[in-house]
Regions:
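Active-site rim/adjacent substrate-binding subdomains
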Residues: 1-148, 153-190
């Protein structure tokens, strides 16, 4: 079922998600709703907080995104990330590298706002599977960025938390538009 995406300033976006039982039928329903909602919004990732539920569940699907390549490794061996899409993250634990890369990011909870965000170049991921097991992989490129972005949501962190105070002042007006549910007006380039 397609659910409403919660926009910036909703308290649930700052809520740390509770761990869940991955085998629960309620979690499967939540995952189905996350995928339906993400695809309807044409996103590459969506966290449970973004549809109003503060639990540690997120979904990602970078299939077909060629302009921003993804990388994935399992047990140190490179694999094709498309073979593992769509992806479900349940109670994920991350270990990001110290090396950072800055690239542009958007967020379905911040419609129309794209920012340059520094993120780890690569991240090791351990997540639960629907049968209660574990799945471990490393991710880089767009997939790594999407994992880091969505798992931030699961802990009540937003991509605007990664920008400087000066940049935050520059987007203050845009954030007010989003809070009111209004589109950010087009601005002329300097």
């Amino acid at each position: 079922m397609i659910r409403e995406i919660v926009h910036y300033d909703a308290p649930v976006l700052r809520a740390k998600g509770k761990e869940v039982d991955p085998t629960s039928p309620a979690i499967q329903k939540l995952i189905d709703d996350l995928f339906d909602t993400m695809r309807h919004a044409r996103g590459v990732g969506l966290a449970s907080q973004q549809i109003g539920e503060a639990v540690q569940v997120a979904v990602i699907d970078i299939s077909g995104v060629k302009e921003r390549p993804s990388k994935m490794w399992i047990k140190g061996e490179p694999v094709d990330p498309e073979d593992y899409m769509p992806m479900i993250l349940i109670n994920p634990v991350l270990k990001p590298t110290k090396t950072k890369i800055t690239s542009h990011e958007g967020c379905l909870s911040f419609p129309g706002l794209t920012l340059d965000i520094p993120r780890a170049q690569r991240v090791a991921v351990k997540t639960r599977t629907l049968d209660g097991g574990h799945f471990e992989f490393d991710a880089g490129g767009l997939l790594g960025r999407a994992v880091l972005h969505e798992v931030d949501h699961l802990h009540g962190r937003l991509y605007i938390d990664h920008i400087s105070a000066e940049e935050r002042r520059e987007i203050k007006e845009d954030l007010e538009y989003i809070k009111r549910g209004e589109p950010i007006p087009e601005r002329e380039e300097d």
